[in-house]
Amino acid sequence: SLSMPEARRRTGRKLSELDFNQPTQLYKDLSSLHPLLDYWKPLGRTMIVNSGAGGWFPPHKDQPMLTRDTFRVCAFISNNVTHDAYEWEMDGHRWPIKAGGVYYIDTRKTHRTHSWKDNSMHLVMNIPKTWENVVKLISATLNY
């Protein structure tokens, strides 16, 4: 996947998460993910992250402002995301992750990850922050 700073460097433009909204060949090839991806259609920048053993993201905040135009949902799509294989920390608290689980990520809070095993894969979706999508998120989490 292409980081936002790298995309901005390559294009010479100030891009937003919503500028990445065209389905790619990977989307077409991964038909098993269509029910989840299409639930939020249209999406902003969306990527699959495959963390190898030792892979990590340092503590950071992606967007500290309440006025951001997207929110983030992450789906853990491999088996190597259990507590002994993968660490997800948010605001100083380690969260237990379930394979197949889908989680809202509050990117205003400090978060970090660390993978202890190969093939810790997750789907990161930046979803337009519309009233309809916020209601979808709340409705989905009521059944959690």
Residue ranges and their predicted role:
Residues 71-77, 102-104, 117-135:
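A short hydrophobic beta-strand segment most commonly corresponding to one strand
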Residues 95-110:
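Conserved metal-binding segment of the jelly-roll/cupin
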Residues 1-39:
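Non-heme Fe(II)/2-oxoglutarate
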Residues 135-144:
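Active-site or metal-binding loop neighborhoods of secreted/extracellular toxin and effector enzymes
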Residues 39-41, 65-69:
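A short catalytic or substrate-binding loop motif that flags glycine-/basic-rich loops and adjacent residues
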Residues 76-98:
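A short beta-strand-loop-beta hairpin characteristic of the jelly-roll/cupin
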Residues 111-116:
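Asparagine-centered strand-capping/turn motif at beta-strand->loop junctions
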Residues 47-67:
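Conserved short histidine dyad/triad with adjacent acidic residue
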